[in-house]
């Protein structure tokens, strides 16, 4: 995002950055290339910005994800970043990170809205996202996602609207109460059989990826 950054004007001018106009999410196709091209980036640990969930009619663009113009604009700016990668980025690990982010964050915002849309609108949304994924993202990336994310994309790619809605509704209503058991070296989620079964419920990799960490700010020696 652009609203919590200070950018050197010399760096901005040298790389001819500019935000695209008349489109939502105009920060994405600028800030991602900006991080790639920068010689260094300084991060401030203190909280300097708080994102507010707005009530009423004046919602943020992220809260208006059921608007299809919003979704199409998001995919448009993702394509802008895709183009930058094609022209500039050689590191495969960055490509893999981009694919993962697109699925885990950027597109999932709209996938999750399936429970608020009519059947026809849900199917329309699924087709738009499916077309973009097939065009741009290696399908094996889906297998790297956490269990429910993976299963939602499998349903989407199969245009199985009823299963997608069932998965999302379970996630909203019951996922927070999921029990996880250890079997050997694996951690298995005890999902209802209608949601996830067998080896598909293996959550080991996801738990390893999101292992809790904490920053150390100070160390003192006590005699």
Predicted regions and their residues:
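Donor-binding/catalytic cores of nucleotide-activated saccharide
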Residues: 1-86, 113-117
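P-loop NTPase catalytic cores that bind/hydrolyze ATP
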Residues: 94-117
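Basic, ligand-binding patches in group-transfer machinery
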Residues: 116-223
């Amino acid at each position: 995002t652009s609203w919590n950054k200070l950018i050197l004007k010399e760096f901005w001018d040298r790389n001819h950055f500019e935000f695209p106009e008349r489109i939502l999410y105009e920060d994405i196709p600028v800030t991602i290339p900006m991080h790639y091209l920068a010689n260094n980036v300084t991060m401030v640990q203190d909280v300097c910005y708080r994102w507010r969930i707005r009530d009423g009619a004046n919602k943020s663009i992220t809260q208006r994800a059921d608007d299809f113009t919003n979704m199409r604009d998001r995919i448009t700016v993702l394509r802008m970043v895709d183009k930058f990668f094609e022209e500039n980025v050689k590191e495969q690990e960055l490509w893999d990170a981009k694919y993962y982010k697109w699925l885990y964050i950027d597109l999932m915002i709209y996938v999750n809205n399936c429970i608020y849309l009519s059947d026809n609108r849900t199917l329309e949304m699924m087709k738009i996202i499916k077309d973009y994924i097939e065009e741009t993202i290696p399908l094996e990336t889906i297998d790297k996602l956490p269990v429910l994310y993976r299963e939602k994309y499998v349903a989407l790619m199969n245009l199985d609207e009823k299963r997608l809605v069932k998965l999302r509704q379970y996630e909203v209503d019951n996922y927070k109460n999921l029990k996880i058991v250890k079997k050997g070296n694996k951690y298995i989620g005890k999902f209802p059989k209608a949601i996830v079964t067998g080896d598909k419920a293996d959550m080991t990799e996801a738990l390893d990826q999101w292992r809790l960490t904490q920053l150390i700010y100070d160390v003192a020696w006590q005699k």
